[in-house]
Amino acid sequence: MGTYCFGIDVGGTTVKCGLFRTDGTLVEKWEIPTRKENNGDQILPDVAAAVNAKIEEKGISKDDVEGVGIGVPGPVNSKGEVDRAVNLYWGYKNVAGEMEELTGLHAKAGNDANVAALGEAWKGAAAGSSDVIMVTLVSAVELLLMARS
């Protein structure tokens, strides 16, 4: 198992990036602009460049990186594919597959509200709770209910 992982939140204005230890400890966070021109074609290459630059800056071997988790606005299937993300101007996009190609790292993608709720349940305000309701309000309202019964 790698020592590090990246968490990425793709928003309509900025992409929030985090380098973490696999125990959930935040090492560093930063943002890059979300470039939506040309149907958002540069968003994932920009994210990959930011991840690769941080690996180089910190002197981390890619063998020490478990992977990249990326949250995007819109429905994401179990393969990490998006059929449409309206506020990013995306039609179909294999988010996980493209990130793997661009970074050489294992990647998983999910809906931004879902992965935010998972993070809160693991290390955030909902840690230790058996049931969680998360509401996000950014460019859209999203609601997630997690019941661990």
Where are these regions (language model features)?
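Glycine/GP-enriched mid-protein hinge/lid loop-to-helix segment characteristic of carbohydrate kinases
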Residues: G2, G18-G24, E28-W30, N39-Q42, ...
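Short glycine-rich, Thr/Ser-proximal phosphate-binding strand/loop in the N-terminal lobe
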Residues: G2-A49, E56, E81-D83
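Short, glycine/acidic-enriched loop or turn micro-motifs at the edges of active sites
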Residues: G12, V115, S139
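Short beta-strand segments
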Residues: D9, G67-P73, M134-L144
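Structural signal for hydrophobic packing residues in well-ordered secondary-structure cores
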Residues: V51, I55-K58, T103
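Glycine-rich phosphate-binding loop and adjoining helix at the ATP-binding site
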Residues: D41-A48, D64-V68, G74-I133
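Alpha-helix termini
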Residues: I55-K62, A125
